[in-house]
């Protein structure tokens, strides 16, 4: 769509401003400005003036809430030069729009972003019976028992432009990329000084893994994903039950424009009950839980929720919610439906002599989950 703009300017100086001729350009994606010159008229001191009109084309791939930057390079007939820029926000952002991007280019899509192709669908992948218990993490059974464990990833995962072969999983609902000895339970803003950097806060809160709770890790070779699942863990303050998982997609198999890995967060049982106040004195930890991401400097990131408050683009989390974290703007969330092979004949051992031809019909069926894709290899020996 084409947008027409003229600027209203105020001269706060003590002298009249001269007439400027300005070129208008932009480096912002999804925004096109053909080479244009505008004129800013002479403005009296403490007076108001206008620029001439210019236009720009905004592509349909632009998201509500995104900030676009327009650059102005201006000069007068006397050789005076002025460089300036103007920020404009696209549309009006609401809970049905993605959160972001941050300064790196990450977005967080939630289940309510139904007008966008990358809207995630909740589809819990339970790894309790097949995953590896993270025994160090599972030692967190109460006050000051916080634990974290370093896990070797089965693939290289790129996050904020940095490549990692390990992650650190904490009992308190977060993952750090690389090795960390932190066990931070006091959740904070994202990005911010609290906790490790980089960080994926899945449900960062003061949690315990006692009373049947546990944390598991599992590599699904068929789906090319690594899953971390906090299963029936409890909030330390109110003993509320929480079950949630983070699914890391192998970037070598699931490509993105930046090469960064994508992440799906799923919440089977979500109870955001820790208000951070224990009755007098300094609160022991931040209010409620933190959900979001931050980079290795701790300066760039996206905060989906903290202290039970949400930005305009975020939908309130609840049971059976999903979040998808990506640098992509188009496409679809990867299909993680589980396939299952069924053969019409399982006795397929044959001996064939020289010059003999044997014909056999075998039917291969996918009896797995709806929309699953079955990959298979047939070999002979």
Q: What would you call each of these model-derived segments?
A:
Residues 1, 47, 144:
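Acidic, glycine-anchored loop motifs typical of Ca2+
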Residues 5:
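Short, surface-exposed binding/anchoring microloops in extracellular/periplasmic proteins
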Residues 34-39, 54, 105, 153, ...:
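Cysteine-rich, disulfide-stabilized extracellular repeat modules
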Residues 58-60, 87-337, 367, 372-373, ...:
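Extracytoplasmic Ser/Thr/Pro-rich, glycosylation-prone low-complexity segments
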Residues 79-85:
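Beta-sandwich strand segments
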């Amino acid at each position: 769509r084409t947008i027409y703009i003229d600027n209203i300017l105020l001269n706060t100086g003590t002298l009249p401003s001269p007439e400027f001729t300005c070129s208008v350009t932009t480096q912002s994606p999804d925004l096109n400005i053909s080479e244009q010159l505008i004129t800013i008229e002479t403005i009296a001191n403490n007076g108001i003036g206008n620029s001439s009109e210019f236009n720009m084309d905004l592509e349909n791939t632009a998201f509500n809430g995104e900030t676009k930057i327009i650059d102005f390079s201006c000069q007068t007939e006397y050789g005076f030069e002025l460089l300036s820029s103007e920020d404009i926000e696209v549309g009006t952002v609401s809970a049905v729009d993605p959160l972001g991007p941050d300064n790196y280019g990450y977005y967080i899509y939630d289940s309510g972003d139904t007008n966008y192709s990358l809207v995630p669908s909740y589809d819990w992948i339970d790894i309790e019976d097949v995953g590896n218990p993270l025994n160090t993490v599972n030692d967190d059974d109460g006050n000051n028992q916080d634990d974290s464990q370093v896990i070797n990833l089965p693939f290289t995962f790129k996050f904020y432009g940095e490549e990692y072969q390990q992650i650190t999983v904490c009992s308190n609902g977060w993952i750090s990329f690389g090795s960390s000895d932190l066990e931070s339970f006091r959740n904070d803003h994202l990005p911010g000084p609290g906790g490790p950097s980089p960080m994926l806060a899945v449900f960062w809160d003061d949690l315990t893994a006692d009373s049947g709770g546990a944390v598991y890790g599992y590599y699904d070779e068929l789906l090319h994903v690594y899953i971390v699942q906090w299963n029936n863990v409890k909030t330390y303050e109110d003993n509320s039950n929480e079950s949630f998982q983070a699914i890391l997609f192998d970037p070598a198999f699931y490509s993105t424009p930046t090469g960064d890995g994508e992440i799906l967060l799923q919440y089977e049982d979500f109870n955001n009950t820790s208000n951070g106040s224990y009755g007098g004195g300094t609160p022991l930890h931040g209010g409620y839980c933190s959900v979001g991401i931050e980079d290795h400097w701790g300066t760039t990131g996206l905060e989906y929720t903290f202290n039970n408050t949400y930005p305009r683009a975020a939908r309130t989390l609840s049971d059976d919610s999903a979040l998808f974290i990506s640098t992509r703007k188009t496409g679809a969330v990867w299909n993680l439906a589980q396939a299952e092979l069924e053969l019409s004949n399982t006795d397929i051992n044959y001996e064939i002599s020289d010059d003999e031809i044997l014909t056999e019909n075998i039917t291969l069926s996918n009896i797995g989950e709806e929309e699953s894709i079955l990959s298979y290899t047939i070999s002979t020996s």
